[in-house]
Amino acid sequence: MVSKTTGGTDLDKAAENGQTQAVTTVEAQYVTSANAESINPYVGKLITGLSISGVTAEQQAQLLPILTEKIGDAVSVDGVFKDVTNLGNTGYFSEVNPVFTTVPEGVKLDFAVTVNPITTGVSFEGNTVYTSEVLTKFMDLQPGQVLNSVYVGQKVQGINAAYARDGYMLAHVDGIRVDDQGVLHVHIVEGIVEDIVPAGNKKTRDKVITREFVQKKGKPFNKFLVRRSVERVYNLGFFDDVNVRMLPGNQDPNNVIIEIDVLEHKTGTITLGAGYSKSDGLMGIIEFGEDNFRGTGDKFKVHWEIGGKKKYKNYQISYLKPWIDSKGTSLGFSFFNREDEYTDYNEDGNEVAEYNKKSRGFNISFG
């Protein structure tokens, strides 16, 4: 499998995990002037000669058997079209044109072909997920050989499938060209994330949402990273619903803007309680907290107990800041004051001692 961080060494498994596009049929890229109008004047005439020009005699001998029309056959539109297709589908020609020469006995049929350029190497542009070294090894173009458009097309599909398999659903080969030196240039667009834009958040600040994204701006869109990012935003506990929309990029139509739509709910709580016992008398409890303080994502809580015969005033105040740097380091503190009454009993169940335990202090958490 391809490693996105180390560059990987094997793109040949791109058809794994359902990526069947790596093995679909690839059409050869060539042009032809053949049409029914140009062939009709020769339909029915006897083919007295059959040749392929633009290649060596040895190559012609290898190619002639793939032609369906033979010497002695009558010219037909379908037959000429089929032979143009057969030659074009070899992948070695950029142009295939039938040429008729009238002779007393009938016509001589020649297929004039233009051979693709000889490649000297391959160059990749726009790739950041896979290294050029890995892609070059996968393409496996041997210098000095004629470019085969079918072979190249299959390799291009393999590259596209590898991107899709690894979650880069917007990445694909965008263009191919051969320069005057015979170098095959492969241009790849990877679907860069131009921006991450929160929407629907009336209280929560934008940065509280975007800092949870493991999918980063300026990096190729990856559906697995976006999925994890949405889960992290939802797990903040501030929202009833979190959805993602993909919008076209402003700088480049191949890029994408991620809009994350949220539906907020209340994050503050207030608890009031009261109780009575003979030992303690009437006690009251007040507790209030906020899990998204002023939309910053900070959390605070105040717990206060009042009343009782001893007029206890137990309280605890805590505050947590989940992000103090870009790495998600948290810092929290709590301050508490507590007094509890304890009673000891003997084996007969009689009270033998009564004492109070007081505690006061603070805690600091970091990490």
Residue ranges and their predicted role:
Residues 2-108, 112-119, 123, 361:
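N-terminal, post-cleavage mature segments of outer-membrane
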Residues 18-53, 118-123, 142, 160, ...:
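Acidic, glycine-rich low-complexity/disordered segments
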Residues 43, 79-80, 99-107, 151-152, ...:
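Short, glycine-/polar-rich solvent-exposed loops and beta-turns at beta-strand/coil boundaries
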Residues 60, 64-67, 77-85, 132, ...:
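Extracytoplasmic/secreted envelope proteins and their assembly/folding machinery
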Residues 64-74, 147, 214-223, 304-308:
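Short, polar/charged loop or turn motifs at beta-strand boundaries
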Residues 104-138, 181-192, 259-266:
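Signal peptide-directed extracytoplasmic domains
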Residues 131-133, 158-160, 172, 203-206, ...:
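Gram-negative/organellar outer-membrane beta-barrel architecture
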